[in-house]
From Swiss-Prot:
Keywords: Cytoplasm. GO terms for molecular function: catalytic activity. InterPro entries: Endo/exonu/phosph_ase_sf, Endo/exonuclease/phosphatase, UPF0294. This is UPF0294 protein YafD. The keyword Cytoplasm applies. Its main location: cytoplasm. It comes from Salmonella typhi. Belongs to the UPF0294 family. It holds the Pfam family Exo_endo_phos. It is found in: Cytoplasm. The keyword Coiled coil does not apply. HAMAP family: UPF0294 (MF_01119). GO terms for cellular component: cytoplasm.
Amino acid sequence: MRKNTYAMRYVAGQPAERILPLGSFASIGQALPAGEPLSSEERIRILVWNIFKQQRAEWLSVLKNYGKDAHLVLLQEAQTTPELVQFATANYLAADQVPAFVLPQHPSGVMTLSAAHPVYCCPLREREPILRLAKSALVTVYPLPDTRLLMVVNVHAVNFSLGVDVYSKQLLPIGDQIAHHSGPVIMAGDFNAWSRPRMNALYRFAREMSLRQVRFTDDQRRRAFGRPLDFVFYRGLNVNEASVLVTRASDHNPLLVEFSPGKPEQ
């Protein structure tokens, strides 16, 4: 882990807290503290969105209309402006961000808003070899009502690289976390899978981790070179609903998925 890899936690009424990597889930997964369930319902609603550093109008109205009822909001390119932090802390018990790089005023990176405090938090970063800008990922774990633990992986994959070596390298520590977790998993975000080799690497990783891809009937996901960039993968859950919200509030469209934590599909 790089020494400058950390997460910042935002909670209402408390100062921002720096969270350092705890190490592999393999070493501490059996000793996690008890926590409140992410949801008291028989469903888990998530919103996944590259928010484009909040550079366009209406981003806040989209979050207010579609994010406030979600149990999890997985943002990429989230810039910790006062407006976003205020929304996050007013509507969620915890908001964890992994700063990928610091813009003139506010850090930008993946950010996970959750209706419960995570019992595990592991920030990850990978530097793009060409632009030398970092992309971040965040692994968090939440209790479910059925006593299982849900692992959530929020990913913004490296974009500019020659070949797929760095792309695959970024997935390795994520795979280490998932491989040592026996419960359900949601892995989602902007995977920048704009080439056939990248797509193959991502699908191969998903197969190795026994992850399924959420399918969208009216697939309005952002595309590059004809390939979707945003994905939701899962394991140990059922998909109830999945849709893509078409909006001009970012250069990506938000993904809305509802899961049920009951008996997984066969």
